[in-house]
């Protein structure tokens, strides 16, 4: 048997053990319960009929149930889900930290991801289901979830925390639906993704010049599912990305290639848990919209082509988002080694926000984009500061 064949055999045997035996928990709700916290699932229907699932940690077992708890609403990035906020476990994950601090924690899921692949009328195999970008997530999903949370809890406002695309959709919401500013106590944007003209991610830089140019082919391909999750891919990723696997470094480099190289903040024991939950799926158009942002250097709506734009917007070019409408307090947290959200782009955003409350460059030189959710010292360098700032608004 050749060495290559032997490696394949070992991999398939290991995969069989994963399929037959124990594996990291892939479901967010089950993971929360396994960690000893109370969990609720809630369904929300948007005004354009997408059915979304939220996960809730109503209180911490350390503090017990109480009434009138302030609300923290957490929103994930692209290809991610609510699982990101609990993946590192108690004491280390932001959702658990906030619950321990007395918050009623709600975690959203955008249309098209693992937990929100449903529509009142359209099955997911219809192309029209996937005809959205992060613009629609900001215009419809986040407002619908916030309205539901406020109605359910009786609170008047939420503390918003977003990572990556979770920051983008917040800015879309408050720019284009400014009435939602009144429902936000403060917005904590981790790795804020708005202006992206100086992005260093080699993947985006390689493909954006082609995929970020509107044309008929891109328009057709945009309304498709992008990197969906399924059990086979999860099991294969879990086996290949175990800390003891010969492929562990390859898995780590995949993460570094997206958000920036930082071995000091990556726990190799977490890799198989990441693969159990990510990627969580999205629409191709979400990725194309970010490619357009890189090409244009602007923070603006989706570019459908010069033929369709006049019908959609009344102009040949898509309009910029109205950041002047973002009146709720915004706190920016960003890293010097973030390949997705360059320091210069974040500071351009900072200078355009009318109510900037915090400019926080993470005091760790190699801090990268995905360290905000998976970094071993995320609590020390980011979450403690987020919690302190949130409490100042209570």
Swiss-Prot record:
Q: Which enzyme class?
A: hydrolase
Q: What EC number is given for this enzyme?
A: 3.1.1.-
Q: Which residues are glycosylated?
A: 131
Q: List the disulfide bonds.
A: none
Signal peptide residues on this chain, from the entry's feature table: 1-20
- Report where it is expressed, by tissue: Fat body.
> So where's the catalytic machinery, residue-wise?
164, 369
Q: Which GO terms describe its molecular function?
A: phospholipase activity; triacylglycerol lipase activity
Domain of life, per UniProt, equals Eukaryota
- Give coiled-coil spans as residue ranges: none
Please report which protein family the annotation says this sequence is part of: Belongs to the AB hydrolase superfamily. Lipase family.
Spell out the PANTHER family in the cross-references: LYSOSOMAL ACID LIPASE-RELATED
Name of the featured protein? Lipase 3
**Organism encoding this protein:** Drosophila melanogaster
Give the gene symbol: Lip3
């Amino acid at each position: 048997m050749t060495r290559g064949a032997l490696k394949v055999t070992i991999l398939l045997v290991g995969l069989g053990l994963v399929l037959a035996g124990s594996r990291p928990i892939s479901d967010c709700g089950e993971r929360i319960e396994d960690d000893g916290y109370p969990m609720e699932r809630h369904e929300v229907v948007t005004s354009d009929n997408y059915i979304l699932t939220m996960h809730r940690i109503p209180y911490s077992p350390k503090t017990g149930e109480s009434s009138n708890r302030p609300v923290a609403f957490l929103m994930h990035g692209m290809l991610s889900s609510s699982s990101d906020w609990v993946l590192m476990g108690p004491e280390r994950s932001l959702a658990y930290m906030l619950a321990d601090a007395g918050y009623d924690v709600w975690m959203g899921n955008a249309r098209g991801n693992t937990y929100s692949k449903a529509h009142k009328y359209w099955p997911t195999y219809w192309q029209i289901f996937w005809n959205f970008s992060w613009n629609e997530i900001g215009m419809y999903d986040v407002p619908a979830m916030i309205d539901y949370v406020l109605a359910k809890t009786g609170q008047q406002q939420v503390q918003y925390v977003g990572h990556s695309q979770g920051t983008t959709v917040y800015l879309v919401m408050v720019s284009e639906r400014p009435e939602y500013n009144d429902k936000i106590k403060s917005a904590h944007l981790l790795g804020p993704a708005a202006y992206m003209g100086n992005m260093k991610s080699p993947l985006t830089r390689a493909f954006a010049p082609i995929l970020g140019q509107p044309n008929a082919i891109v328009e057709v391909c945009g309304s498709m599912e992008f990197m969906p999750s399924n059990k086979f891919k999860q099991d294969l990723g879990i086996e290949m990305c175990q800390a003891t696997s010969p492929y562990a470094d390859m898995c780590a480099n995949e993460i570094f290639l997206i958000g920036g190289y930082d071995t000091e903040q990556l726990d190799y024991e977490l890799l198989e848990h990441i693969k159990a939950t990510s990627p969580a799926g999205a629409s191709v158009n979400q990725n194309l919209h970010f490619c357009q942002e890189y090409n244009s250097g602007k923070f603006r709506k989706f570019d459908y082509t010069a033929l369709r734009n006049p019908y959609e917007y009344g102009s040949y070019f898509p309009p910029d988002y109205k950041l002047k409408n973002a009146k709720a307090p915004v706190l920016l947290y960003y890293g010097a080694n973030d390949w997705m959200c360059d320091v210069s782009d974040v500071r351009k955003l900072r200078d355009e926000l009318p109510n900037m409350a915090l400019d926080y460059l993470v005091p760790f030189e190699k801090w990268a984009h995905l360290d905000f959710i998976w970094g071993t010292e995320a609590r020390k360098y980011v979450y403690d500061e987020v919690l302190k700032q949130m409490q100042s608004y209570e």
